[in-house]
Curated annotation (Swiss-Prot):
UniProt biased composition (Basic and acidic residues): 143-152
Protein name: Small ribosomal subunit protein uS9
Assigned GO CC terms: cytoplasm; small ribosomal subunit
Single GO MF annotation: RNA binding
One Pfam family in the UniProt entry: Ribosomal_S9
Renumbered residue ranges of the record's region Disordered: 136-167
Basic residues composition bias: residue spans: 153-167
NCBIfam families referenced in this protein's UniProt entry, alphabetically: PRK00132.1
Coiled coil: none
Keywords on record: Ribonucleoprotein, Ribosomal protein
Family: Belongs to the universal ribosomal protein uS9 family.
GO terms under biological process: translation
């Protein structure tokens, strides 16, 4: 072990490692170009979250969403839910490659959006299995097991007890 530089007489500033960076070296990444995906049949998958169940058909197209016969803007007016639904397509950079037809049943908007995200991610790995690591890393292939806890008798809600009086 050597002493710190200020106490080491043999150490000079010239001995320190110097990193040389070339100015003309560019870091621009070329835009990823994907070949159009060819699938022989529509890919059908199911996603679930809370009480919501979503059945998705993925077909090659222009990035159009049809949810229970309505557009994504009509079905999910909340931008957060729209962004949540589109996130698997954004992750694999295929937002304009597929049309998505979905049938959503049960639950509320948040549960349906989560179920739709899972179904889209599952459909994408059926089309292109090499996208699986990116989707898995982003957490899109994990089924969220959380659901509403049941109400117990003797309690007002699942865990809320009636007021207790000591005397």
């Amino acid at each position: 072990m050597t002493a710190p530089e200020e106490f080491n007489e043999d150490y000079t500033a010239e001995d320190a490692a110097v990193e040389v960076v070339e100015e003309d070296y560019g870091y621009e990444a070329e835009p990823a170009t994907y070949a159009p995906v060819v699938i022989d049949r529509p890919v059908q998958t199911v996603g679930r979250r809370k009480e919501a169940v979503v059945r998705v058909r993925l077909v090659p197209g222009t990035g159009q969403f049809v949810l229970n016969g309505r557009s994504i803007e009509d079905y999910f007016p909340n931008k957060v839910h729209q962004q949540l639904v589109k996130s698997p397509l954004v992750t694999v950079e295929r937002t304009e490659s597929f049309d998505i037809h979905a049938r959503l049943v049960g639950g509320g908007p948040s549960g349906q959006a989560g179920a739709l995200r899972l179904a889209i991610a599952r459909a994408l790995i059926e089309v292109t299995p090499e996208d699986r690591p990116a989707l898995k890393r982003a957490g899109f292939l994990t089924r969220d097991p959380r659901a509403t806890e049941r109400k117990k008798y003797g309690l007002k809600k699942a865990r809320k007890a009636p007021q207790y009086s000591k005397r």
